[in-house]
Amino acid sequence: MTDVALIDAGGANLGSVRYALERLGVDARLVRDAAGLQGAQRVILPGVGAAPEAMSRLRAQGLVEPLRELQVPLIGICLGMQLLFEHSEEGDVECLGLLPGIVRHMTPALGIRIPHMGWNQLVPMRDSALLAGLPERASAYFVHGYAAPVTADTVAACDHGGLFTAVVQNGLRCGAQFHPERSAETGARILRNFLEMSFP
């Protein structure tokens, strides 16, 4: 993979995602405007924080429409994945609308703490090259208080007081709710799969 664009949307995990890519032998270039997307073969949208601020930053950078029109594979990570959906309850904000569904606040319950923090098991829902090479009952590291619903696009779910989307794919649009850069071999494998897999 010769040209990977890493969008700087102000997420605190930007540096750790970049380092995770470096461990895979990928020198991703930081993108802060639409011109930076030119020539990219893969685009990564990381994010930590709140959806309204992240969408405001993408708008200020002139990246909202270019991301909506992108014709190369894109993966959103953590908040970046949530931004791929139509809408988020967090701040009642319109998102990129690349995937159907509304991101909703997770509901606390007896024994269920919100935000969801820590390791949790992935529950495969359908075949996707994103999961290639993962062992059964693979786990990943999550930190989030909002979650996307399980839809026909869900590749893997996770259960924390109810199922939510952990890995998603619709054509060129992919996402991981967990932090691949903090998820050891599981995270490295999914990042590598995204970079190397063939897309329809």
Swiss-Prot record:
Annotated active site: 78, 179, 181
Subcellular location: Cytoplasm
Entry EC no(s): 4.3.2.10, 3.5.1.2
GO molecular function, one term: glutaminase activity
Keywords: Amino-acid biosynthesis, Cytoplasm, Glutamine amidotransferase, Histidine biosynthesis, Hydrolase, Lyase
Catalysed reactions, as listed in the record: 5-[(5-phospho-1-deoxy-D-ribulos-1-ylimino)methylamino]-1-(5-phospho-beta-D-ribosyl)imidazole-4-carboxamide + L-glutamine = D-erythro-1-(imidazol-4-yl)glycerol 3-phosphate + 5-amino-1-(5-phospho-beta-D-ribosyl)imidazole-4-carboxamide + L-glutamate + H(+); L-glutamine + H2O = L-glutamate + NH4(+)
GO CC term (a single one): cytoplasm
Glutamine amidotransferase type-1 domain ranges (all copies): 3-200
Chief location bin: cytoplasm
Segments passing through the bilayer: none
Keyword Lyase: yes
Stored CDD domains: GATase1_IGP_Synthase
Domain of life: Bacteria
InterPro entries linked: Class_I_gatase-like, GATASE, Imidazole-glycPsynth_HisH
Pathway recorded for this protein: Amino-acid biosynthesis; L-histidine biosynthesis; L-histidine from 5-phospho-alpha-D-ribose 1-diphosphate: step 5/9
Alphabetical list of SUPFAM superfamilies matching this protein: Class I glutamine amidotransferase-like
Subunit field text: Heterodimer of HisH and HisF.
Its biological purpose: IGPS catalyzes the conversion of PRFAR and glutamine to IGP, AICAR and glutamate. The HisH subunit catalyzes the hydrolysis of glutamine to glutamate and ammonia as part of the synthesis of IGP and AICAR. The resulting ammonia molecule is channeled to the active site of HisF.
Entry protein name: Imidazole glycerol phosphate synthase subunit HisH
